[in-house]
UniProtKB/Swiss-Prot annotation:
It comes from Shigella dysenteriae serotype 1 (strain Sd197). GO terms for biological process: 'de novo' CTP biosynthetic process; UDP biosynthetic process. One of its GO terms (molecular function) is UMP kinase activity. This is Uridylate kinase. Belongs to the UMP kinase family. It is an enzyme of class 2 (transferase). NCBIfam families: pyrH_bact. The gene is pyrH.
């Protein structure tokens, strides 16, 4: 397969789900997966790519589930946001151990734990090739971490949002349930909406569409997939205008 000599993106926003960090355990953080992801991010930095990362928190806490059981949704979402900060701390530690300069920012001020999110500071760090980990979602309840990824992607003027998942891309149906499901290589925003494909929640997706922010869905569990994506090779599903 032909490989471009240079990466096709200069600045990316990588969206990692909390589940991506839990490995086969089904809960918590798998240290070996964390270290592998840190190495893959390090490769991007060495290629000269500026990397922003938004991490979910579903491996530690899910607010929506407890909301159904009667917990106040705002309280549940605040707990979920704090779970993303815990994941961010773990990822920052893994990056530091891999000798990658990384800064953790939170949309909720947590003095003494990490920096508060500042758009200007994030841009400045990215320009200096620091990996910027963006935690606590948007800082508001009722918004998913996918919404946070698209919002931060637009704010930092990323070339693309790379949504790392457990499947190879966007399929015609759920590949786990339907063996005949096939993967799309490329889609437009309108096609995703027309076909009602589950890429991300509607608020997040329409935000990306309105700001013409491309989204690429790929499988982070495939070693080297992240590098192949940034080098412009066929990997995952690309969603653009």
């Amino acid at each position: 397969m032909a490989t471009n000599a240079k990466p096709v993106y200069k600045r990316i926003l990588l969206k990692l789900s909390g589940e991506a960090l839990q490995g086969t355990e089904g809960f918590g953080i798998d240290a070996s997966i964390l270290d592998r992801m840190a190495q893959e991010i390090k490769e991007l930095v060495e290629l000269g790519i500026q990397v922003g990362v938004v991490i979910g928190g579903g491996n530690l806490f899910r607010g929506a589930g407890l909301a159904k059981a009667g917990m106040n949704r705002v309280v549940g979402d605040h707990m979920g946001m704090l779970a993303t900060v815990m994941n961010g701390l773990a990822m920052r530690d893994a990056l530091h151990r891999a000798y990658v300069n990384a800064r953790l920012m939170s949309a909720i001020p947590l003095n003494g734990v990490c920096d508060s999110y500042s758009w200007a500071e994030a841009i400045s760090l990215l320009r200096n090739n620091r990996v910027v980990l963006l935690s606590a979602g948007t800082g508001n309840p009722f918004f998913t971490t996918d919404s946070a990824a698209c919002l931060r992607g637009i704010e930092i003027e990323a070339d693309v949002v790379l949504k790392a998942t457990k499947v190879d891309g966007v399929f015609t149906a759920d590949p786990a349930k339907d063996p005949t499901a096939t993967m799309y290589e490329q889609l437009t925003y309108s096609e995703v909406l027309e076909k009602e494909l589950k890429v991300m929640d509607l608020a997040a997706f329409t935000l990306a569409r309105d700001h013409k922010l491309p989204i690429r869905v790929f499988n982070m569990n495939k070693p080297g997939a992240l590098r192949r994506v940034v080098m412009g090779e066929k990997e995952g599903t690309l969603i653009t205008e």
